[in-house]
UniProtKB/Swiss-Prot annotation:
This is UPF0284 protein Cyan7425_0342. It comes from Cyanothece sp. (strain PCC 7425 / ATCC 29141). PANTHER family: PTHR38811, UPF0284 PROTEIN SLL1500. GO terms for molecular function: nicotinate-nucleotide-dimethylbenzimidazole phosphoribosyltransferase activity. Belongs to the UPF0284 family.
């Protein structure tokens, strides 16, 4: 149920080390005004919808389907939120969940740890975040990474940031990686040209030195608040436990950022304790090159082989047409279910469709 795509020996050793262990799931919520650009993301049908995606996903992750949620899941162009997958695993396995608000314009309706961050301005400004905020969020990430590592055998670090694959492209490009046509998106065919134009604008307007900018300055110029928090958590947690960065393009960028920060800030970490885990919809997306990006960033890439080909729900079948693909740690959660409980295709699909059934019932009952 879990395929290794890059650095297979390291990836397999990591899987063997943590098989049978129950991780904690930390989901870091953030916001960038990049996500409001028309057409930039399919994680919400309109820019107005996308303002609420992260807080709606957070509420659903903890509470599951409810008759009258404070923030209902936003309508999508096609498909269903990946939080259905994440919630099915969290509830089925009893995963400890920690929600972190790294910088949201509206706080979630459920309990979340407020890290004192701020939403990012559009990366095209070249001034996405205040540098003081970036330093503060790195410190928070380091502190919480160490704290959680003291309590759990390994950490599953997920995210919800609409527009986050575009800020990921900006970070990867700024760090010197040739990522322009390799990233993914929530669209069935990745909008590479749109992303690249925005990234070029942001890097061009920023005060960064073109060759080898300092990583914290780079985040301040074109990043988002989630990235720096998860990079800090990864560095600190890796000293004691394993880290599964749950996501695709965004988590490859976080890994590259963590490595750059550890180097420039002279922070000790254990990169061999870290892997990226995603869905096969991301890993095998023909309109991106996740495997090539993982090879370039030099990290083991895992992918859950979860399939929705035979799902009863058209919204889930849409994943097989390239819609949505990943988010809210969905791929990492599926990997954790297979590692901890040996869940295969049938167990995962049954659990996810049970959540889908409940969601359909409460949506119909509330007129949603």
């Amino acid at each position: 149920m879990i395929r290794t795509y890059t650095q297979r020996a390291l990836a397999q050793a990591w899987l063997n080390r943590f098989r049978g262990h129950l991780p904690a799931f930390a989901c870091i919520l953030g916001f960038t005004q990049t996500g409001l650009i028309p057409g930039i993301s399919a994680a919400g049908a309109t820019p107005a919808d996308r303002q609420y995606t992260a807080i709606a996903d957070a509420e659903f992750l903890l509470n599951g389907p409810q008759p009258q949620p404070r923030y209902p899941l936003p309508p999508l162009t096609a498909g269903a939120s990946p939080v259905l997958i994440s919630h099915a695993v969290v509830s089925g396995l009893g995963l400890p969940v920690y929600l972190f608000n790294a910088g949201l314009p509206i706080p979630p309706a459920v309990s979340a740890i407020d890290l004192g961050g701020e939403p990012a301005r559009c990366l095209s400004t070249g001034a996405a975040l205040n540098l003081a905020t970036v330093h503060h969020l790195l410190t928070q990430g380091l502190v919480w990474g160490e704290t959680l590592a003291d309590q759990h055998p390994y950490l599953l670090l997920g995210e919800c940031v609409v527009g986050g694959t575009t800020t990921a492209l900006a970070i990867l490009t700024g760090l010197g990686y040739a990522a322009a046509t390799k990233v993914n998106s929530s669209h069935p065919i990745c909008n590479h040209a749109q992303k690249w134009e925005i990234v070029q604008q942001g890097l061009g307007r920023s005060p960064l030195k073109p060759s080898h900018p300092a990583p914290l300055d780079l985040v301040a110029a074109v990043g988002d608040p989630m990235q720096i928090v998860v990079a800090g958590m990864t560095i600190a947690a890796s000293r004691k436990v394993g880290v599964l960065l749950a996501g695709g393009t965004q988590m490859l960028a976080v890994y590259a950022l963590a490595r750059a920060i550890a180097c420039t800030e002279q922070l000790v970490w254990q990169p061999e304790a870290v892997v990226v885990g995603t869905t096969r919809w991301v890993a095998e997306d023909p309109t991106g090159d996740t495997v090539g990006l993982a090879e370039e960033t030099d990290i083991p890439l895992l992918g859950s082989q979860l399939s929705f080909v035979r799902s009863r729900f058209p919204q889930l079948q849409a994943y097989e047409q390239g819609y949505v693909k990943e988010g809210v740690g969905a791929g990492g959660c599926a990997i954790a279910a297979s590692l901890y409980r040996g869940w295969g295709q049938q167990e995962l699909l049954t659990a996810i469709e049970a959540v889908g059934d409940r969601y359909s019932q409460v949506s119909a009952g509330s007129g949603g």
